[in-house]
């Protein structure tokens, strides 16, 4: 389900979770639309398409393409942790304020109750065990369109950890057989991460 975005979309629909509608090439009537590989990751080969001519070009470039309606709104990543029985322990949504090559370089924790509720529904339906990362777009009228589930820690999971998620400590507790409960109370809402590119200089003669 999680490795094929077509199956992921059908799964979301089956449990009452909003997701962008998939559109066949011949049925595209309005623009913009969004195109990407149905088995891709990050932002590789992912494009907003604004007209028919561009779509006809991108459909030949993008491998294993899937076309969906374009949803305008705030992008979110949700860092999640479940125990080995599928019980949810942490759900930490964060806004993707600035993105480079599919990875957030500026992000802020937002403990949005609706996102947390929908994410818990997804995790419980999938019976996810361990770490997972869920992507969605939240519109201005508070509709939440979920787009993918990745069964791993995200590239910026350190924000969830730094804000109080303590994923590593909980995994150690799980390995020791301790029973844990869902707990977001230690997470700092609004906590911000900014990533910088650092340059280091070395003199080979010294």
What are these regions (language model features)?
Residues 1-73, 84-87, 113-117:
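Active-site nucleotide/adenylate-binding loops and adjacent lid/helix of ATP-dependent enzymes
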Residues 21-23, 133, 183-185:
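Residue-level detector of family-conserved "landmark" positions at structurally sensitive sites
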Residues 25-28, 186-192:
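Short linear loop/turn motifs
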Residues 47-53, 61-63, 68-132, 138, ...:
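ATP-dependent carboxylate/phosphate-activation module, predominantly the ATP-grasp catalytic core
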Residues 197-206:
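Non-catalytic, C-terminal membrane-associated alpha-helical segments of glycosyltransferases
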């Amino acid at each position: 389900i999680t490795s094929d975005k077509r199956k992921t979309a059908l799964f979301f629909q089956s449990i009452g979770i909003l997701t962008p509608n998939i559109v066949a090439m011949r049925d595209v009537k309005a623009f913009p639309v969004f195109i990407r590989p149905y088995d891709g990751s990050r932002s590789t080969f992912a494009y907003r398409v604004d007209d028919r001519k561009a779509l006809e070009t991108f459909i030949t470039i993008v491998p294993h393409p899937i076309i969906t309606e374009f949803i305008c709104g705030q992008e979110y990543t949700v860092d999640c942790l479940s125990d080995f029985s599928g019980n949810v322990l942490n759900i930490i949504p964060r806004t993707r304020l600035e993105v480079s090559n599919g990875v957030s370089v500026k992000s802020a924790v937002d403990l949005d109750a609706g996102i947390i509720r929908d994410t818990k529904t997804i995790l419980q339906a999938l019976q996810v065990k361990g770490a997972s990362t869920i992507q969605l777009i939240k519109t201005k009228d508070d509709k939440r369109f979920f787009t993918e589930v990745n069964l791993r820690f995200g590239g910026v999971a350190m924000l969830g950890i730094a804000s109080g998620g303590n994923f590593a400590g909980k995994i150690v507790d799980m390995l020791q057989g301790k029973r844990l409960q869902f707990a977001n109370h230690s997470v700092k809402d609004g906590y911000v991460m900014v990533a910088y590119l650092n340059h280091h200089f070395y003199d080979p003669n010294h």
